[in-house]
């Protein structure tokens, strides 16, 4: 049991250190991340659509 408490204590100590180093992203950084994420979703959707169309053409829908 003391080992578990020590592991929890170490985890909390390391977590606190990480939170002290991190910062909240600014509006520009947030917009950039949102644009990149949106483009990634669109790209994956287009690839899936192309694979589906090719499957319909090859296998005869």
Curated annotation (Swiss-Prot):
Source organism: Pyrococcus abyssi (strain GE5 / Orsay)
Gene3D superfamilies attached to this UniProt entry: Preprotein translocase SecE subunit (1.20.5.820)
GO biological process: intracellular protein transmembrane transport; protein secretion; protein targeting
Name of protein: Protein translocase subunit SecE
GO CC annotations, alphabetized: plasma membrane
Keyword annotations from UniProtKB, A to Z: Cell membrane, Membrane, Protein transport, Translocation, Transmembrane, Transmembrane helix, Transport
Cellular compartments annotated: Cell membrane
Transmembrane annotation, as ranges: 39-59
Pfam families: SecE (PF00584)
Membrane topology, as annotated: Single-pass membrane protein
An annotated Gene Ontology molecular function: protein transmembrane transporter activity
Source superkingdom: Archaea
Entry similarity comment: Belongs to the SecE/SEC61-gamma family.
Matching PROSITE patterns: SECE_SEC61G
The keyword Protein transport is assigned to this record: yes
Role: Essential subunit of the Sec protein translocation channel SecYEG. Clamps together the 2 halves of SecY. May contact the channel plug during translocation.
Description of how the protein assembles with itself and partners: Component of the Sec protein translocase complex. Heterotrimer consisting of SecY (alpha), SecG (beta) and SecE (gamma) subunits. The heterotrimers can form oligomers, although 1 heterotrimer is thought to be able to translocate proteins. Interacts with the ribosome. May interact with SecDF, and other proteins may be involved.
Signal peptide extent: none
